[in-house]
Amino acid sequence: MLEKSYAKINLRLKVVGINDDNYHLLQMVNTKINFYDVLKFKKTKEKIINVYMKDVKQEENLVYRVASYMFNKYSLPGGLDIKIKKNIMIGAGLAGGSANAATTINAINKLYNLNLNIDEKREIASGFGTDIIYCLDNYPALVEGIGEKIKPFNISTKQNILIINPNIIIATKDIYNQYDALYKYSEPLDKEVLESLDLKKLLENDLEQVVFAKYPQILNLKKQVLEYSSNVLMSGSGSTIYVIDELKTLKKIYKEIKKIYPEYKYVLTKTR
């Protein structure tokens, strides 16, 4: 069975507090984009789970951990081979690992006819990472709390988007720790207010200030893209910068920025 595992971007990411368990409270607007990894699932007779992915040890892979947990929890027969063809950059703020884990939950549910409802799948996901909870679905959403509160968010049309990744791997935990030490928490806005904002006002990311201070090359990249479009933002804790605009404008940005940074990764696609 082949399954696509779609990348996620944050159209908005505000850090609004921290709870008693030291988890950050967030207000995010997330959407999937038409850029994905491909996971191949194959049942095997031998009682073993194998995950094949370049440059990542099996035991450290979220996919392996999630699959092992579900096999134990539901006493599933035989084993499973999972091959991951990676396209989504690692440590890039695109939730590639979380998306792969969510795809695995959905795939095992389907392969073994578990008939899990969304709440049951979210409960599994919450044990491995809050980003996985949103990644179980494919619609734009307002995501709050520590990532467990999800409501559909009204975005009227699919948007053209250019992804630019500067080949920097960023550890999310480090960025949040630095944010706590240096910055104040933001005030959340009502869903109706957020849905009424135009795109330029919606696009905000509190983590940019931390990442830009540590990685000035990412700040420089954003400034250079802003010369062509105002709808530019870093996704998640970085390092990816994206721009949403008309296709003609995005093609021009791609052409001009690639002259400066030919070694960066570029993806021209659409939101889902």
Task: Cite the ranges covered by each PLM segment.
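ATP-binding N-lobe of GHMP and related small-molecule kinases
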Residues: 1-92, 110-120, 144, 154-155, ...
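Short Gly/Ser/Thr- and Asp/Glu-enriched loop/turn motifs at secondary-structure junctions
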Residues: 6, 79, 138, 234-239
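Short beta-strand scaffold segments in enzyme catalytic cores
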Residues: 13, 37-41, 131-136, 141-142, ...
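Short, basic/glycine-rich phosphate-binding loops at helix/coil junctions
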Residues: 45-57, 104, 126, 195-205
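Conserved, helical-rich catalytic subdomain that frames metal- and/or nucleotide-binding sites
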Residues: 49, 135-137, 141-231, 244-263, ...
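Glycine/serine-rich anion-binding loops at beta->alpha junctions
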Residues: 83-112, 130, 231-243
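Contiguous, small/hydrophobic- and glycine-enriched helical/loop subdomains that border
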Residues: 105-142
